[in-house]
Amino acid sequence: MDGSKLGKWASMKLGTLDIQGNTWLAPMAGVTDWAFRCVCQALGAAVTVTEMVSSRALVYRDKKSMSLLRKTDGGVCGAQIFGNEPSVMAEAAAFALELSGADFLDINMGCPMPKIVNNGDGSALMRDPERAARIVEAVVKAVSVPVTVKMRKGWDKGSCNAAELAKLVEEAGASAVAVHGRTKTMLYSGVADWDAIRAVKESVSIPVIANGDIFSAEDAVKCRARTGADGFMLGRGTFGDPWLFAQCEAALRGEEIPARPPLSERVDVALRQFDLAAEDKGEHIACLEARKHFAWYLRGVPYSGYYKEKISSISTMDDIAAIAAGIKRDLR
């Protein structure tokens, strides 16, 4: 892999915001909580984004929804909201920023899940571009930070309108767009269409963030060559592997790619994440959610099946500590 041919580059502009680096952590419901975002930011993510939060829930001051907006302690962090009513989205955006102090506001027009699109939210907005543009315009007027939009390639293979929608939201005041190279109907199946992302890049003058199928440093380099994108949003590839950000950043700059640390160090990072989660959500919820995260940290580790089974019944921080000690003792 020869990232040097792509030139030395390490920053991008998001409106008036200077971003050092080009990797973004994708907003993912049930995954990108404050603890995981803090870990990813510390290990090299240039930008992190909160889990998506309902605009209606924010307007009604729902405490659980409000708790999702906690900003990372460092780095650039955006708050993502979803909804389909311009006035409600504007009010929610202003409140989200007041509550979180986020560096930018992201509008979700990409979530493909039925419970979201059936309400006209998420990727359903790709079928109503005029409404989508009105939402962006209303939110831009309501906040003083850059506004970005997360979208997909389109609704289905017969309506791949990301380039057209990107132009509309740019005209409405968006400072950047992130594009997942799959349609709504594809969900996460098949292969991300990076050529569709290139079409968006060629249609707008604002930064374009490429999303979909970036699982390695080599993927990031290939994605940049294929799309010409300004930034690269990492999603499922980061599960249990927050070191992917530093690897991608190095590859994109043509530098030597750092190796993943040994298992003992990876376990220590997992423990740090779970401590942060307990601080943020309390021990009970943190331990329930640690089950999936801890299993992800052990992906690809030989002979880890025994510990993965034990992880599935974690209920206390003491359980986590005991399992971590066993892993460090028995596995490599």
Sequence positions of predicted segments:
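Alpha/beta enzyme core
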Residues: 90-121, 129-206
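Glycine-rich, positively charged N-terminal anion/phosphate-binding segment
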Residues: 6-13, 28-103
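Alpha/beta catalytic cores of nucleotide-metabolism and tRNA/nucleoside-modifying enzymes
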Residues: 2-15, 19-23, 29, 34-35, ...
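Aromatic- and acidic-residue-enriched carbohydrate-binding clefts of CAZyme catalytic domains
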Residues: 126
